[in-house]
């Protein structure tokens, strides 16, 4: 099944348990409680996106939120893609769709944290930043020594923006060709 046959949609509270199961299958992602996943799918549905296959199964999910002190910023918390859908561009498709929806609500910046050894996430976000026409900066947000007692890699903050609409960016690229 290709990522084009997957339907992207706003999550709902019926997705919470399935999200918990999806994240558990997506090592090395940290699992949260089912309750946390229910909140991500209900209270934070405007800053999340779900991907389901033709059988209605959850095969991808991105959770995020707008930090209260920075309402013009979408912070992407977690990106999960089922193993059967990896390598088909689904994560990028979900991320760009989520950013487009958030931008319509005033979001101008995109943030996430990525550990230094997570090359796949680094590549995903760098591709997204390029598609969005957004420069980015990085800094260690949570350090292995100070915040994780040596038990977790550093979490490096990536901050991109100001964002250009995905559609506007594609139009700019076509005009310059």
Residue ranges and their predicted role:
Residues 92, 116-138:
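Conserved active-site alpha-helix within GNAT-family acetyltransferase domains
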Residues 6-19:
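A short beta-loop-alpha structural element at the N-terminal edge
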Residues 81, 87-100, 123:
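Conserved acetyl-CoA-binding loop-helix of GNAT-fold acetyltransferases
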